[in-house]
Regions:
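Hydrophobic, well-ordered secondary-structure elements that form the walls
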Residues: 245-248, 266, 295, 327, ...
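Conserved beta-strand->loop/alpha-helix structural units within folded catalytic cores of enzymes
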Residues: 48-50, 241-244, 259-267
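A short beta-strand-to-alpha-helix junction
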Residues: 104-110, 228-239, 282-291, 304-331, ...
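Phosphate/adenylate-binding glycine loop and adjacent helical scaffold
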Residues: 329, 335, 339-390
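Histidine-centered active-site microenvironments of extracellular/periplasmic hydrolases
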Residues: 60-64, 251-253, 257-258, 262-310, ...
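A structural motif corresponding to the C-terminal end of an alpha-helix
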Residues: 117-122, 244-257, 298
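Active-site-proximal alpha/beta segments of enzymes that process anionic O-linked groups
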Residues: 1-217, 292, 324, 329-350, ...
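Active-site-proximal cap/lid insertion segments
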Residues: 134-139, 191-251, 255, 277, ...
Length: 390
């Protein structure tokens, strides 16, 4: 069984130390997970960095930031999705690992989604991701987190900007084509709309101009013309994400198998659009702009034909508040994997799904706070889109 892992780093995992390796190995050895579907399924979760949902055309945004995805059939956008943290280490941790509504998770004794899939009979797992710049932390993080997924490969950008997410596409095509005959999970982890925005897309995707964005501090005049350049550049990152996701969908379509794609952003972004003119993310008091994230599903015709019930349940949950932690259990159900770690009340593909009544998030002060209120203006825009899609 082959696992190709190109990964990115987070110092927090490296600081946990090598002693975590033995604990994770013991957990992996005792995992139970079985694929029950007679169908051959290819699943592709895509973790995107830094994307505020209300800058997406699919959520009613006034700009065409999703011109390709907007034309896609079999695509379900979840407009009321919230993250669990406004910084990547905590938020992605709760996407890859099973977490409860109180946000509790211990990654040293909780199986990663990819590990459960790897344990399932006849299912392989591949993870391809962009990387951070510090190779020392990358190596430690990869050794600890992906220790049970076989061979590791590091694509590093030691002295230059991290390449745009389109660099993932050749690997995605190669892996999907090579595994088109079997159950397969491909995880893509991009850098999305993370700062510096102009580095996150090629020139051909600089459609909103001017976009010569530069960071100059947190205290600015709300009428400063430079703010619009920042917002233009951020919208260009979403335009590029639209291109990347549409390209992956085309690859999945071409393989002709039952397949699905799930995209979820780890957190949103402040671009001088809060009352106290915040910029970037990981603020000490989490904002709506950081909390409201993009979440979507795409399904092939073949998948819908054989798994219509699961797809219909996901559509039913478009109109209620959901959280990024739901992705873990939803993917397990879309793959029809049986494991004690599966919780149907946290799967959007289940009729037993329970709405999150008390949404919470970790903020930059490393504290849990209530999720910020959803602005009425944004809610009205989203509701109009949902009404038009009926």
């Amino acid at each position: 069984m082959k696992y190709l892992v190109l990964y990115r780093d987070y110092k927090r995992y490296a600081d946990a130390g090598k002693e975590a390796l033995s604990a994770r190995q013991a957990l992996f050895d005792t995992l139970t997970c079985q694929a029950t579907s007679r169908d051959t399924i290819i699943g592709c979760p895509v973790i995107g960095e830094t994307s505020h949902a209300c800058n997406w055309q699919l959520a009613g945004y006034h700009r065409e930031t999703n011109p390709r995805l907007a034309k896609r059939k079999n695509l379900v956008f979840i407009p009321y999705a919230a993250t669990t943290a406004n910084a990547t280490p905590r938020s992605v941790e709760r996407i890859l690992f099973s977490a409860h509504e109180d946000l509790a998770v211990d990654w040293t004794c909780t199986p990663m989604l990819q590990e459960l899939v790897a344990k399932a009979i006849g299912v392989e797992a591949t993870a391809v991701a962009t990387t951070q710049n510090d190779k020392r932390y990358s190596e430690d993080y990869g050794e600890i987190l992906f220790s049970n997924l076989g061979r590791h490969y590091l694509l590093d950008s030691m002295f230059g900007p991290i390449p745009p997410d389109e660099c993932l596409l050749p690997y995605a095509k190669q892996e999907i084509v090579n595994h088109a005959h079997q159950n397969f999970l491909l995880t893509l982890w991009g850098y999305g709309g993370h700062w510096s925005y102009p580095d996150r897309y090629p020139e051909k995707h600089a459609v909103f101009k001017p976009c010569n964005a530069q960071y100059w501090g947190h205290s600015v005049d709300p009428h400063d013309k430079r703010i619009q350049a920042l917002r233009n550049a951020f919208d260009n990152t979403i335009y590029h994400t639209d291109y990347v996701l549409n390209s992956v969908i085309s690859i999945l379509e071409h393989c002709g198998k039952s397949s699905f794609l799930v995209y979820v952003a780890d957190h949103g972004e402040n671009i001088y659009n809060t009352e106290d003119m915040l910029f970037l993310h990981a603020s000490y008091l989490g904002t709506h702009q950081e909390n409201h994230v993009s979440l979507l599903f795409w399904f092939s015709d073949g998948y819908i034909k054989k798994h219509r019930k699961e797809v219909d349940y996901i559509k039913e949950h478009q109109r209620i508040p959901v959280m990024s932690i739901d992705v873990y259990h939803t993917i397990l159900q879309l793959f029809e994997l049986q494991t004690p770690w599966f919780d149907s009340t946290q799967s959007l593909a289940s009729g037993a799904y329970c709405e999150h009544k008390n949404q919470q998030m970790y903020n930059g002060a490393h504290q849990i706070q209530p999720a910020p209120p959803f602005p009425q203006e944004e809610r009205m825009s989203i509701d109009s889109i949902l009404a038009a899609s009926r």
